[in-house]
Amino acid sequence: MIDNQKYVILSLELHLFFSRIMKEHALFLEAGFTNKNYNLAMEADHYKKQFEDLLSYTVSASNGIIRPDILYSEELVTTLTSVAEQKTEEFTGIEINKNITTRELNLQSGVNPQVGQDLVNYVAQLNSDAIRLLDGLINFKERVLDGVLSCTIFTSNYPLLLEHIIHEANLYRSYVVDLENKIDIESKNAKEIELFWDHIMMEHALFMRGLLDPSEGELINTSNDFAIKFNELIEKTNEMTDSNIKNITEETLNETVEFKDFKEAGASGIEQCKIKSIILPLLADHVLREANHYIRILESYKNM
């Protein structure tokens, strides 16, 4: 059981990371529909706005509360996020609340913050809102995936990407439910966490490989190499025991840092129009933040 202080801190940190991820999932869905599916695009836009609101309310309560390592990991926003949002808005015509990013860049961390009952109640409402919104968004994503697999909907998003964003939403929801039950989400089974994020990293590499222009041979090959490497790490992690867990975690951390560097160079290259692809700048920044998130988790295991 976690106390009120940890409940508040973990909840706010969770929403700062994942509600931004969810609003961007909705934007990627919206951008991927054709004119025929205007109603689906508008439904995606609805969820984008709802998760923007959730993120905004979370930012309002987070200053001086969240931990330094979360703030400095660049899993919430990166140095590229603001420009990525601006360019993605220009490319798609989809409105993005960029003020939230500015506010997040100005957040300050806290150490042993005072948490009163009013803040506990505020966070409980955020968690309740998050579960309600996630139930709707997961259902929407599943309907889109079903339509794509039955060939009744066309989208520029891969079916695997749709499955990928459903898995992330389900993970987010499970964490919110755990927090409402006062379960410490940081004490989750390390093997399960590593397997989840290894799959996510592998799929990122596959998406990047498939969204780069065919002329970008070197980048395509590097993306493919990362996909192979994370697939190997999945196999190793599946067989992980107490005797080799530290070695495998260390190997995974090193590989994820390398992949993060590749993603960062790619995001910068896409923003500067130096890489030929059909990757939205915000998608490049999105996958970079997820790598940063995983790196922080792996580093926390090293220190245990």
Swiss-Prot record:
Role noted for this protein: Contributes to the formation of thick-exosporium spores.
Family annotation (InterPro entries): CotB-like
Effect of gene knockout: Inactivation of the gene produces changes in the ultrastructure of the spore. In thin-exosporium spores, the absence of the gene leads to a thinner coat layer. Inactivation of the gene has no significant effect on the presence of a polar appendage. Disruption of the gene does not affect the integrity of the spore.
Cellular localisation: Spore coat; Spore, Perispore
Main location group: other
GO BP terms, alphabetized: sporulation resulting in formation of a cellular spore
One Pfam match: DUF2935
Keywords of this entry: Sporulation
Claim: Cell membrane is one of the keywords in the record: no
Organism whose genome encodes this protein: Clostridioides difficile (strain 630)
Protein name per the record: Spore coat protein CotB
Upper taxonomic lineage: Bacteria, Bacillati, Bacillota, Clostridia, Peptostreptococcales
UniProt key word Metal-binding: no
